[in-house]
Amino acid sequence: ATQMLGENTGIYIGYSVDTGRNVYLQPSLASQGVKGTVTNALASAFVGSLGGGKSFCNNLLVYYSVLFGGQAVILDPKSERGNWKETLPEIAEEINIVNITSDSSNQGLLDPYVIMKDVKDAESLAIDILTFLTGISSRDGEKFPVLRKAVRTVSQNQNHGLLQVIEELRKEDTAVSRNIADHIESFTDYDFAQLLFSDGSVENAISLDNQLNIIQVADLVLPDKDTTFEEYTTIELLSVSILIVISTFALDFIHSDRSIFKIVDLDEAWAFLN
């Protein structure tokens, strides 16, 4: 086993119990392509038992990365970081907390066509969300092409939203298209679902321009990690769909100004990486 932990300089995160040596990390090092670095892997995971300090260590690295000039987006499904403006007054002006609730004023805010800047990205995400909710596989030669055609048609409209996909399916007026339209529409009755479905008139109101952005979604009901997809309840399907949209939006943020080191922090990542 190696006794080499971390870098020679960087953020102090603790010390090795075996050697007594301090451990430092430079989170941005792997992304800079520095000659001689051991890895250029950009993904990190905090794994351990309940109460083992995963969140604390994670929060520490994000905090110091921001102090060193980085930019971060934290997806906080359990809303554990809502008080950071008060507890971190030294960077309060750079903290942006986005609270997403099922209030009617937020209708359509997380519609793929609203939240994604690029239409092609929005179209791809729309397909992902609708196939996830309905369980229609891309290998389903009867239903998938019909759904795909409706989504592509909506993407070509000047204003677009997921509710228009239902309209396009009804215009097709076949037994298959009506069945898919009814299936998708059955989700829109839930208060929570209105975040995902817009009529094309909603404008993106989520900004990630601050150095530290925290996205919180109220009332998420996440499935247990041992629950199979077939056992998900409707509200669990919608909750995971919302996490997929937000995480895709956050990852899109990575591709903005590449001169700035960025972190996308997915708390409870197992819920949508399973």
Regions found by a protein language model. Give the residues of each.
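P-loop NTPase motor domains
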Residues: T2-N22, S79, E86-P89, S102-N274
